From Swiss-Prot:
Protein name according to UniProt: Glycine cleavage system H protein
Function of the protein: The glycine cleavage system catalyzes the degradation of glycine. The H protein shuttles the methylamine group of glycine from the P protein to the T protein.
Domain Lipoyl-binding, first and last residues per copy: 24-106
InterPro entries cross-referenced by the UniProt entry: Biotin_lipoyl, GCV_H, GCV_H/Fam206, GCV_H_sub, Single_hybrid_motif
Cofactor notes: Binds 1 lipoyl cofactor covalently.
The family this protein is said to belong to: Belongs to the GcvH family.
Assigned GO CC terms: cytosol; glycine cleavage complex
Length: 124
């Protein structure tokens, strides 16, 4: 069974979002997603200050099995990227909710996310 954290919200495309309560958010891929993809070998991160429109791909995670896009859950601006993934993309496999986060962003509104109960149902 995949780990799901109850302090986050989730997207249909298996990303997690942590709301810091000040208009900033941290985002990564879920445990379910990293398990399906397998061992990570490369992460293509966006640039700081990039502005991304809702549902646009802005990041790519590559594993030994496949490459997968990461999509914006809202109109957002990148404020920080996890540079540790440049040297250790496998952090996503070992610690997808903590050390393996992808980006931090700011946004005026992040809607249409699933809470832990709803996300758990789509995994069943």
């Amino acid at each position: 069974m995949s780990e799901i954290r109850d302090d986050r919200q989730y997207t249909q495309t298996h990303e997690w979002i942590l709301d810091h309560g000040d208009g900033t958010y941290t985002m990564g891929i879920t445990d379910h997603a990293q398990a399906l993809l397998g061992d990570m070998v490369f992460v293509e991160l966006p640039n700081i200050d990039d502005e991304v429109s809702i549902e646009d791909e802005f990041c790519v995670v590559e594993s030994v099995k496949a490459a997968s896009g990461v999509y914006a859950p809202a109109d957002l601006q990148i404020i920080k990227v996890n540079k540790a993934l440049d040297d250790e993309p496998e952090l996503i496999n070992y610690s997808c909710y903590d050390d393996g986060w992808l980006v931090k962003f700011k946004s005026h509104s992040v809607d249409d996310l699933m809470n832990v109960a709803v996300y758990a149902q789509i995994l069943d």
